[in-house]
């Protein structure tokens, strides 16, 4: 199985959040980002599939439903590599707190849930650096679907429709996201990922998040 070669020795702190769609992780990260900035911390945000180099190509292909599971893996690995080199590492060298909405664990969970070989996927990210903290916001696929459907219908790939699990996108969503959740659960102890109950209120989740983040930052010499 994939192992990070070593912890980074850069001045900054890398904090990542993970979870299935609808877990509320992005909301929590935004609140955390705004709070850290408000108390004078140097902080930068980066998210999955946002590299200027390739994200537009990936989004066009997704809209046309053209991506096989392995192609998905490759495109996201290229995107990640570019952001790691151009955004994450420079910010860490400068002493910033880097907040990442999804990290390599997203690929490890989603791609394997799509049937891609686990060792192959992990091998794509052999260059990744180990985060200082990874938080996993845990919620059931059913609750996730309920939250998403309050605003929109499930998207083609997040519902796993490319896998032909069911002709019904709602049923397919639950099946696929359950698979993704199962992969995340396998990784918790393996990668020392901290689980947060995402069924709690937004305020309670943020309180849990800040308490953990404060401890990690204190270990890096940052007292909040």
For each feature predicted by the language model, list its residue ranges.
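Walker A (P-loop) phosphate-binding loop of P-loop NTPases
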Residues: 22
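Hydrophobic positions on the alpha1 helix immediately C-terminal to the Walker A/P-loop
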Residues: 28
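Conserved lysine of the Walker
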Residues: 25
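A glycine- and Lys/Arg-enriched "phosphate-lid" helix/loop adjacent to the NTP-binding pocket
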Residues: 107-180
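Hydrophobic anchor at the beta1->P-loop junction of P-loop NTPases
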Residues: 17
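Conserved nucleotide-binding/hydrolysis micro-motifs of P-loop NTPases
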Residues: 50-52, 104-105, 139-145, 202
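ATP-dependent small-molecule kinase phosphotransfer cores
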Residues: 35-129
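Extreme N-terminal, non-catalytic leader segments
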Residues: 1-14
């Amino acid at each position: 199985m994939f192992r990070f070669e070593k912890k980074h020795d850069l001045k900054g702190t890398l904090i990542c959040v993970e979870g299935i769609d609808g877990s509320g992780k992005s909301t929590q990260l935004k609140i955390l980002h705004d709070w850290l900035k408000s108390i004078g911390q140097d902080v930068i945000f980066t998210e999955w599939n946002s590299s200027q180099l390739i994200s537009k190509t990936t989004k066009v292909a997704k809209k046309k439903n053209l991506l096989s599971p392995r192609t998905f893996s490759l495109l996201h690995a290229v995107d990640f590599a570019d952001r790691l080199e151009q955004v994450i590492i420079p910010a860490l060298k400068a002493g910033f707190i880097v907040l990442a909405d999804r990290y390599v664990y997203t690929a490890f969970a989603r791609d394997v849930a799509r049937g891609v070989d686990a060792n192959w996927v992990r091998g794509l990210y052999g260059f990744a650096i180990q985060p200082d903290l990874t938080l996993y916001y845990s919620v059931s696929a059913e609750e996730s679907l309920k939250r998403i459907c309050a605003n929109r219908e499930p998207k083609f790939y997040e519902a796993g429709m490319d896998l032909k699990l069911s002709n019904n996108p709602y049923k397919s969503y639950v099946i696929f996201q359950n698979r993704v959740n199962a992969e995340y659960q396998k990784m918790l102890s393996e990668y020392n990922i901290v689980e947060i109950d995402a069924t709690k209120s937004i305020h309670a989740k943020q309180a849990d998040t800040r308490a953990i983040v404060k401890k990690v930052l204190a270990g890096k010499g940052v007292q909040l």
